[in-house]
Design a protein with these regions (language model features):
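Conserved glycine-rich cofactor-binding loop
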Residues: 10-13
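Conserved glycine-rich Rossmann-like NAD(P)H-binding loop of the short-chain dehydrogenase/reductase
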Residues: 26-43
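The beta1-alpha1 cofactor-binding region of Rossmann-like NAD(H)/NADP(H)-dependent oxidoreductases
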Residues: 55-65, 97
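Conserved NAD(P)H cofactor-binding loop of Rossmann-fold oxidoreductase domains
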Residues: 83-88
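Active-site loop immediately N-terminal to the catalytic Tyr-X3-Lys motif
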Residues: 93, 140-149
């Protein structure tokens, strides 16, 4: 029987890292992506089932490239867990538009880029799971988050 494979973005820290370790401990192939290559390499050197695929999700072409690298290595992907995100709270008087644009590029468009990289594959396969970690800010404003939320 073939091992199942999960692709996790935002896998160098936090929820993504914890999930990568959990799935690796259950015997899954874990493809972990994030910008910080040194943290990914630390994970892949520590856990046999974890493989590092460095990625900046704001780069559409790179998302597709990494997806193809994962397929080439493992022959399939069963679950995608997209947990890439950033947050930099600021009071309204201190908002930096460029910084806000970066938050949207990573949190929103990065997730869209990741989904677009796998959607045709899952449709053709007629199987697969995409899970997205989101922010409560989509439901309720947070302190010092004037530019991000409802």
């Amino acid at each position: 029987m073939n091992k199942k494979t999960i692709w996790i973005t935002g896998g160098s820290t936090g929820i993504g890292k914890a999930l990568a370790i959990k799935f690796a401990s259950k015997g899954w192939n874990v493809a972990v992506s994030a910008r910080r290559e040194e943290l990914l390499n630390e994970l892949s050197n520590t856990y046999e089932n974890i493989s590092a695929f460095p990625l900046d999700v704001t780069d559409k072409l790179k998302c597709n490239e990494v997806f193809n690298q994962i397929i080439n290595k493992f022959q399939s992907i069963d679950i995608c867990f997209f947990s890439t995100g950033t947050w930099n709270p600021k009071k309204e008087k201190d908002i930096d538009i460029e910084q806000m644009e970066d938050v949207f590029k990573i949190n929103f468009f990065g997730t869209v880029n990741s989904i677009k990289a796998v959607e045709k594959y899952f449709r053709d396969k007629k199987d697969g799971i995409i899970t997205i970690v989101s922010s409560i800010a989509g439901y309720r404003g947070l302190p010092n988050s004037t530019g991000y939320g409802p």
